UniProtKB/Swiss-Prot annotation:
GO terms for biological process, alphabetical: DNA recombination; DNA repair; SOS response
Lineage of producing organism: Bacteria, Pseudomonadati, Bacteroidota, Bacteroidia, Bacteroidales
UniProt protein name: Protein RecA
Keyword list, A-Z: ATP-binding, Cytoplasm, DNA damage, DNA recombination, DNA repair, DNA-binding, Nucleotide-binding, SOS response
Species this chain originates from: Bacteroides fragilis (strain YCH46)
Cystines in this chain: none
Presence of keyword ATP-binding: yes
Intracellular or extracellular location(s): Cytoplasm
SUPFAM superfamilies membership: P-loop containing nucleoside triphosphate hydrolases (SSF52540), RecA protein, C-terminal domain (SSF54752)
Task performed by this protein: Can catalyze the hydrolysis of ATP in the presence of single-stranded DNA, the ATP-dependent uptake of single-stranded DNA by duplex DNA, and the ATP-dependent hybridization of homologous single-stranded DNAs. It interacts with LexA causing its activation and leading to its autocatalytic cleavage.
Amino acid sequence: MDKIEKSFGKGSIMKMGEEVVEQVEVIPTGSIALNAALGVGGYPRGRIIEIYGPESSGKTTLAIHAIAEAQKAGGIAAFIDAEHAFDRFYAAKLGVDVDNLFISQPDNGEQALEIAEQLIRSSAIDIIVVDSVAALTPKAEIEGDMGDNKVGLQARLMSQALRKLTSAVSKTRTTCIFINQLREKIGVMFGNPETTTGGNALKFYASVRLDIRGSQQIKDGEEVIGKQTKVKVVKNKVAPPFRKAEFDIMFGEGISHSGEIIDLGADLGIIKKSGSWYSYNDTKLGQGRDAAKQCIADNPELAEELEGLIFEKLREHK
């Protein structure tokens, strides 16, 4: 046993009864509802996470919120921008310290995944986001002609990379988030025709898979200022799956914290709703959800108090 530990490091082999199972370490998602839906309070550390959904559904917003939360706790974050579309000003609005964010804009899929692997193995970072799997184009495809048939190259690349990344993220306790897009399978008559890009490897290696969808638009008069968003935990290896979370994503602001407090507070009976009026104890928050949201946004101390009560209630409901 000593020889194995000397060769492969401490913890490479152990008796089942020796190690006490610790509580799962997490990075918060930036959404109270999603933290609750994940069952452990956020994205588990040392695991691979997949966030997928249609275009403009809020995938990157969700990942950027995770980076902001990791940085708030003193963590170091990296962003692999394979799509070459990272907006530093939007990230800053969501709370990201962009000056201390490591960013890479790789030329091809192999380069992106090799950079990701080296960053993870360095043990220097706490969270890494790859945006997106669909943009991880294999080198052979980039160097080939437009009409060349390169079937399965990307799937093979992802499969090879994930075999290496899985053990690396586990050993270094790094949270690795892959953003993925949806495609439609051709000729599917029955069942769901939607599938994610990059083959099946990510489906298997991911400990958590989140399906994010925009539902209704949020309007201020005629102007669209945000959208209601639904997230389903499709796969979860650290807590029960299939839970759902709903929240507002406001354009230019990200997840609406005050909106979550109103919705969860009302659902849990902390905030009383009488007709169209929302109230907490003897304090009237406003007539209509938007007015109540604004009241919460304007009163940080009240927001903090309500958030504390919501956390307590959610813990009781577990």
